[in-house]
UniProtKB/Swiss-Prot annotation:
Catalytic activity annotation: L-threonine + hydrogencarbonate + ATP = L-threonylcarbamoyladenylate + diphosphate + H2O
Gene that this sequence comes from: tsaC
Similarity annotation: Belongs to the SUA5 family. TsaC subfamily.
Species, as recorded: Yersinia enterocolitica serotype O:8 / biotype 1B (strain NCTC 13174 / 8081)
Chief location: cytoplasm
The protein's name: Threonylcarbamoyl-AMP synthase
Functional summary from the UniProt entry: Required for the formation of a threonylcarbamoyl group on adenosine at position 37 (t(6)A37) in tRNAs that read codons beginning with adenine. Catalyzes the conversion of L-threonine, HCO(3)(-)/CO(2) and ATP to give threonylcarbamoyl-AMP (TC-AMP) as the acyladenylate intermediate, with the release of diphosphate.
Length: 190
């Protein structure tokens, strides 16, 4: 840990991920809660902490598209659709892409698709690159509360035991835009 015990160094957060723990980290607009997408235990802990029903599905955030390919059905996309996606990545657009049948239900919820984003936040890029895979990502807030924008706000909502990657959120005021990769339909404005 660093001088301030409320802030974890990257190595501490990586260790927490390997131990199937939930972490908090800064993203483009707010702090996110994240965990290893391949750990059902970690995802269930995140859902319980967030007080979020599993049926809603989750978002994966990554350093690059290659990290997301094991979770989505890349063959469902046309070259034109891929071109559209890559034209705004890394960046603040989350795309909903069809999944493989073996993509875990704890990620997709009641859907046959998954929301994914390649982040342009330098700490998210570093975290996912060093971890070697994407992270589950959901805004750090309890149901009905405002999303956390500072480490202090994370501590108020979630307590002091949650590992929090030291850093600042990016300058964006709104969460990422969410679009359907096949139709272009907008689900959430960014």
């Amino acid at each position: 840990m660093s001088r301030n015990e409320n802030r974890a160094a990257l190595s501490d957060v990586l260790q927490a991920l390997q131990q199937e723990e939930v972490i908090a980290y800064p993203t483009e607009a707010v702090f996110g809660l994240g965990c290893d997408p391949d750990s059902e235990k970690a995802v269930n802990a995140l859902l319980a902490l967030k007080q979020r029903p599993w049926q809603k599905g989750l978002i994966l955030i990554a350093a690059n598209y290659e990290q997301l390919k094991p979770y989505v059905d890349d063959s469902a996309l046309t070259d034109s659709q891929r071109e559209t996606i890559f034209s705004v990545w890394p960046g603040p657009v989350t795309w909903v892409i069809p999944t493989h049948p073996e993509t875990p239900r704890w990620l997709t919820g009641s859907f046959d698709s998954l929301a994914v984003r390649v982040s342009d936040h330098p700490l998210v890029q570093q975290l996912c690159s060093q971890y070697g895979k994407p992270l589950v990502s959901t805004s750090a807030n309890l149901s009905g509360q405002e999303p956390c924008r500072t480490i202090e706000e994370v501590r108020i909502q979630f307590g002091s035991s949650l590992p929090v990657l030291a850093g600042l959120v990016g300058g964006r005021l709104n969460p990422s835009e969410i679009r359907d990769a096949l139709t272009g339909k907008q689900f959430r404005q960014g």
